[in-house]
Structure formats: C-alpha cells, structure tokens
Amino acid sequence: MSEQHDDLVNISMPKSNYQKTPASLDVMDVEQAVRDRYGAAAQAAESALCCPVDYDARYLKIIPAEIIERDYGCGDPSKHIQAGETVLDLGSGGGKICYIGAQVVGSEGHVIGVDRNDDMLDLARKYQDQIADSLGYANVEFRKG
C-alpha cells in the first residue's frame, strides 16, 4: 500500500512537530523511543504528548499537582466503574486514573496500575501512602509490565 495518510497525524501533536518515521527504524528502536519519551515526560510536563481530558474535579482534590501535570491519558473511565470492583489500568503512567479509580471503587474495591516505564512507576508510587492516608484506605498497587 503506497497511499499517503498525512491527515491521520496524532491530533495531540502539532503538525509542525510531526516527523515521518524512517522505514528502516526497527521495533526495538521504536520501543526505546517510547520508553525515552515517557521517561522524560515523568520528569517534566509535556503539553503536546497526549489529549487533554476533563476529569470530575471532586476526584482530583487528593491527587498531587505533580501527578496531574504529568498525566498523558486519553480518557476518563470513572463513569464506567463501580464501588467494589477491581480495576486494571494498562499504561497507568503517573497513576492519575488509578487514584481516581481508587476513590470510585472505594475501600472494598482494588485498582492495579501497570506501566512499562520505571520513571512513571516511580512517580505513581511516590504518593501512594499520602493518597491512602487521604482516603483512609489503601487499595492501589502499581506493577511493571
């Protein structure tokens, strides 16, 4: 297929920042590039990394600003989960969705965040105890995967 799809560029990235990937770039280079990009994003906020989402403000009150500023998620699943459920967040990043989910599922539920990036996992785990203290229960865990 030799069709060109320049109109299918990630909408979160200004077209001027878009670079075509060389055909010779192998899978391991791409995986390393993703790890590097999200590792850097765990250290300093990157506004063009993903799509902005409006979250329910009541769930954001206990989440530290550092996590909110470094959230690169593309959706808010809080309307689709219920008290007592177990939630799995793949690509959990800094943990924002996990900490929102922790509030929705309550003390009887459980949230598991999985990310492949050590820097993002470090950011998510950094505030685990503080958030558990705010909630009055600990129901979130983060795993590498």
Regions found by a protein language model. Give the residues of each.
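N-terminal auxiliary segments of SAM/dcSAM-dependent transferases
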Residues: 2-53
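Electropositive phosphate-/nucleotide-binding environments in soluble metabolic enzymes
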Residues: 28, 32, 71, 114
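Class I SAM-dependent methyltransferase SAM/SAH-binding core
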Residues: 86-90, 94-145
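Short Gly/charged-rich anion-binding patches and loops
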Residues: 33, 76, 96
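Polar/charged alpha-helical tracts
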Residues: 36, 57-66, 129, 134
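Conserved alpha-helix/loop element of class I SAM-dependent methyltransferases that forms part
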Residues: 50-86, 100-104
